[in-house]
């Protein structure tokens, strides 16, 4: 059993999807030339750690990438950032993309108040050589019809894309479709690749995909 699988098991809160992946995936070495890189995101597996602890875990358990803990890097000076990046490079570990640091599914006021935070995150992530952001699209909504929800997503994600693009970064969108989510609320929303493509076309920004 590889170090990475031992780590996931020891956390006791890893998702079934991670645990059930083929053993051969976990036996791959971090420094191989495979195109798919395995990233350690502490939030995804339910652990709390500092940026330094996250990097040590990635080194110990042979992960290829780590999620940037932006709040910590905001408080670092350039010398500290350079030292962190050097340690990553020595161990052939890169940063994964970042999640959006704002609420775009709730009220307009909450969304607007988060735009400044997004801009500040972009500045920090540029120092870390992070390539962009990613967020997921929920497949249902309990209050908004498909068209109303589509228009809100188009307008708000376009604003996000412009800020992200101004910093030379990309913005990835993901649809999710487990049955538990698809049947949760009253109104259906994006749940297929074709529908997601329509949203990307409507946003109409070159850095969105």
Place the predicted regions along the sequence by residue.
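Acidic/histidine-rich catalytic cores of soluble enzymes
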Residues: 65-66, 159-209
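Alpha-helical membrane-embedding segments
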Residues: 152-153, 183
